């Protein structure tokens, strides 16, 4: 007898086999986006959506001359377009298996610029709530990475005050979206100002001066030139701030500072995970690879995921998110899904399926 088993993506139906009069059942396959133990995150821009006509992207900009010519109303219109496109991107991410997304700091352009008329979030509150509602519905994590001009450890009070204003803006956006504590804001340690030990001490002192809404979301990332992973862990233990481990910055720092001794990357994982556990926040890592140009430049794609990151859920019993910092954005993530299918959040089944994550993501 012939093997008459058949699977199709079409809707369920009955098909008659003309020769032997056997009945087939055509099975409908469901695709569901579920949270995974290791999730890959998209940074700010989507190449696929940016190529649409009209383009979909949440980081429109506006130069000062245009603001002066057209006024604050035009600025708000472009911000509204940013937010409308952000809503579309959250839905797109869910359909394409992406559960973590870094928001662009350009979402509200010139929000902290003292040279233009100040404006409130009132005109955008409904859209902010819509973004947050969609992210919470899908159990997606939204984060920020404020620019490197945010310098908590600066010895200059005026620059520190500007940093406060900038970080408050990012915190306010996440708060208006209704996002929980896993929606963090990542900053680097900043410059060393000629004395690393004095700067680390000042960083801790200034951190305690930050508004509570900023401290609730701020996390510290190692960089390739100033703050090593050891420095970040030291600061973390003093002020109880979570540490984001950037794998590429770790390797670059070792190249640029051959006089310093480091253990293998996996050695630091327990301290890093503990920094998040103390605050009850899901751990977050950054992965990138060297591209063309100076040390630290990002490549188009990621060829290899570090083994010590992939084994965290099984070894430590903790689920983690990993931002993919590659120039090809979502295309780099899809390439990794092909190489590491266990990372793909899209699950195909003949039954509707929903997995409950082990930890709360918001």
Regions found by a protein language model. Give the residues of each.
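Polybasic, lysine-rich low-complexity intrinsically disordered segments
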Residues: 3, 11-20
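Aromatic (phenylalanine/tyrosine) cluster motif
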Residues: 5, 21-24, 30
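Alpha/beta catalytic barrel-like cores
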Residues: 29-141, 148-164, 168-179, 209, ...
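Glycine-rich phosphate-binding "P-loop"
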Residues: 184-199, 292-300
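Short, catalytically relevant binding-site loops at active-site mouths
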Residues: 192-194, 225-227, 249-252, 258-259
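Catalytic beta/alpha-barrel core
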Residues: 217-224
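Conserved mid-sequence domains
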Residues: 232, 240-251
């Amino acid at each position: 007898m012939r093997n008459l088993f058949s699977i199709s993506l079409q809707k369920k139906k009955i098909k008659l086999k003309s020769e032997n009069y056997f009945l087939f059942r055509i099975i409908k396959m469901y695709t569901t986006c579920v949270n995974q133990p290791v999730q890959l995150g998209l940074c700010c821009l989507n190449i696929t959506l940016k190529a649409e006509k009209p383009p979909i992207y949440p980081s429109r900009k506006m130069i000062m001359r245009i603001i002066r010519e057209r006024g604050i109303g035009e600025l708000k219109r472009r911000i509204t377009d940013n937010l409308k496109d952000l809503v579309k991107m959250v839905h797109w991410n869910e359909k394409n298996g992406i559960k973590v997304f870094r928001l662009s700091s350009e979402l509200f352009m010139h929000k902290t610029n003292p040279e233009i008329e100040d404006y409130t979030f009132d005109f955008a509150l409904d859209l902010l709530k819509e973004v947050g509602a969609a992210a919470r519905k899908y159990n997606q994590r939204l984060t920020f990475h404020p620019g490197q001009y945010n310098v908590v450890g600066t010895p200059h009070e005026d620059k520190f005050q500007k940093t406060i204003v900038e970080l408050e803006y990012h915190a306010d956006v996440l708060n208006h979206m209704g996002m929980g504590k896993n929606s963090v804001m990542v900053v680097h340690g900043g410059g060393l100002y000629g004395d690393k030990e004095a700067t680390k001490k000042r960083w801790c002192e200034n951190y305690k001066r930050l508004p509570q809404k900023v401290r609730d979301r701020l996390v510290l990332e190692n960089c390739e030139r100033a703050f090593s992973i050891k420095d970040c862990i030291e600061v973390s233990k003093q002020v109880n701030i979570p540490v984001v481990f950037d794998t590429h910055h770790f390797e670059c720092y070792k190249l640029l500072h051959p006089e310093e001794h480091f253990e293998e990357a996996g050695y630091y994982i327990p301290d890093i995970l503990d920094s998040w556990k103390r605050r009850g926040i899901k751990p977050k890592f950054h992965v990138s690879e060297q591209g063309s140009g100076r040390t630290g430049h990002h490549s188009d794609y990621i060829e290899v995921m570090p083994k010590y990151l992939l084994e965290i859920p099984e070894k430590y019993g903790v689920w983690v998110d990993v931002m993919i910092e590659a120039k090809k954005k979502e295309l780099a993530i899809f390439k990794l899904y092909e190489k590491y299918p266990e990372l793909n959040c899209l699950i195909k089944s003949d039954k509707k399926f929903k997995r409950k994550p082990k930890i709360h993501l918001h």
